[in-house]
Amino acid sequence: MKITIISFTEQGMRLGQRVNELLNTMGHHVEMVDRMKNHRVPLKEFAGEYFYSNDALVFIGATGIAVRAIAPFLKDKFEDPAVLCMDELGNYVISLLSGHMGGANELSRILAEHLGANAVITTATDVEGVWAVDEWAKKNKLKLSDRKLAREVSSRLLDGESVEMVSGYKIIGKVPTYLRNSQSPISIYVTNRTFKKSTPEKSILRLIPKNICVGVGCKKDTGIEKMDEAFSAWLTKNQIDGAAIASFATIDLKANEPAILALAKKYKARLKIYTAKDLEKAKGDFNDSEFVEEITGVGNVCERASSLVYSERMSEKECFDGITFASTYNKDLTYAFF
């Protein structure tokens, strides 16, 4: 995590140095800011700069100062960074903002444990000792399909109700009884597919892993809009959630194709580039084309490219007016309950 520690007094700065050393040993990228030496810039302006560029802020000082500093920049818990507040003697570590999604609760516990302080966490699920779907999803790098429904899941569990959880991937440990109610009006699915949709009788919250590689091929200078429309159609046809796309893969001849670059950027996915010789080494049965081989030196780009990333085939080559897609996925994901 990228973390900034902000202190206001000499005592606070000394505590900040201890926190800095601890976080650095944990592999975080940490910056320390001493407001005694940076007082010319108004605090709100100063805090805003760090609020948007950090994963977490640690204020050492009064909670009121921290609240006033960050107030103008708050959006929601899915976008805001974690914000913690500590008193300058290090007695308390307060999880102030983005406890689950931002990781403030976990960071507060870690700092408190190592500094001999008390963690102050007020999130209902934590206080009641109830499983939190948003926190579990974040820890397992899963994206929530519906934020409102995630809140409803937590609300039901806090009220003592149970819901259903289904996973297309291996679960380590025993799934708690409160997640095994098949008669519940809410079900949680760990899936990269969109085929599970809510109905009036059943609400479906999908937890989406980022575990799909899409092989892509296209004609030279294919339009960006055309590529985007074709890919959206492909996602819909194959019932694949765009949030599950981890990477795109193609041949080096298409490495600088604007439409492919734009697609990878839109879906925040890596772009894997392979040579024709690389693609020839791919193992499996592929829908080869003599025409494609004449152009690229290999009979199939999209299927072969995706299979070099993940071995499990998800969809075969499909053509959308000169644009081809195929996909593979990582089936060996595991999720734990302890």
Name every feature range the model reports, one short phrase each.
Residues 31-34, 38-46, 103-106, 289-291, ...:
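Secondary-structure junction/capping motif
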Residues 29-31, 177-178, 311-314:
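Short secondary-structure junctions
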Residues 1-5:
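Extreme N-terminal starter segment of soluble prokaryotic enzymes
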Residues 12-28, 36-42, 49-56, 60-105, ...:
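Conserved mixed alpha/beta catalytic, RNA-binding, or beta-rich assembly cores of soluble enzyme
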Residues 8:
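Glycine-rich Rossmann-fold phosphate-binding loop(s) that bind the pyrophosphate
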Residues 31-33, 120, 270-274:
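General small-molecule cofactor/ligand-binding pocket signal
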Residues 322-332, 338:
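Hydrophobic, glycine-enriched assembly/anchoring segments
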Residues 232, 249-306, 310-313, 319-323:
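C-terminal non-catalytic interaction/assembly regions of soluble proteins
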